[in-house]
Amino acid sequence: MSSQALDSAKIAFIEAAIEHGVLLFGNFTLKSGRQSPYFFNAGLLYSSSLLSTTAQAYAKVLSSSRIPDFDVLFGPAYKGISLAAVSAVSLYQQTGKDIGYCYNRKEKKDHGEGGTMVGAPLKGRIVIIDDVLTSGKAIREAIDILKASPEAKLVGIVQLVDRQEKGQSGSGKSTVQEVEEEFGVPVEPIIGLDDIVKYLESSGKWEKELQEVRKYRAEYGVQRS
């Protein structure tokens, strides 16, 4: 693990997530069946203060060198919708970059403007905004939506949390690493498991939780490339 200190945006996001019960420590059963000592519930990102902190963290990653220049943020329904919207606003406030955002409907609308897409036209260079990549099924469905739009080109994915753990495919790689290799685009998180460990180490208040997370990482963890 890198010894590099956490930056202020990551610290602010982790502290806000813990304060609002979004990042929890305990014993949780994941969809994969694994018993995890921590859990991130993006469904609780509903307060204005927490959304503001989250949006600022997204904007910082979106303006980093790892994410190529882009035109539109795509937030897959449903959790990605609000995340894409607030990220677009925060990015403009931080950098002055004026980009569009859009999202999909789960069901096609046959009245009014119709269609399955809402917001900016799905064309040009697209970055997908999402919460947590687990099996990779949801992100592949989002990418399929882009493939149906011939003028859209995926250039990157930004997610809230990279669990940095081995996927279910047996490759020994994380879902994030598999998606990066399969689609040839960077997948950047606001925070990863290593960042959570660093925060627990530096706080000095979470010794029991730190030991459990370390054990989990030792068994399932994958180092980011």
Curated annotation (Swiss-Prot):
Domain of life: Eukaryota
Pathway where this protein functions: Pyrimidine metabolism; UMP biosynthesis via de novo pathway; UMP from orotate: step 1/2
Keyword tags: Glycosyltransferase, Pyrimidine biosynthesis, Transferase
Ligand binding (orotate): 39-40, 134, 163
Gene Ontology annotations of biological process type: 'de novo' pyrimidine nucleobase biosynthetic process; 'de novo' UMP biosynthetic process; pyrimidine ribonucleoside biosynthetic process
A UniProt-annotated Pfam family: Pribosyltran
A molecular-function term among this protein's GO annotations: orotate phosphoribosyltransferase activity
A GO-annotated cellular component: cytoplasm
Subunit structure: Homodimer.
PANTHER family, A to Z: OROTATE PHOSPHORIBOSYLTRANSFERASE 1-RELATED
Its job: Catalyzes the transfer of a ribosyl phosphate group from 5-phosphoribose 1-diphosphate to orotate, leading to the formation of orotidine monophosphate (OMP).
Family under the similarity heading: Belongs to the purine/pyrimidine phosphoribosyltransferase family. PyrE subfamily.
Protein's recorded name: Orotate phosphoribosyltransferase
Gene: URA5
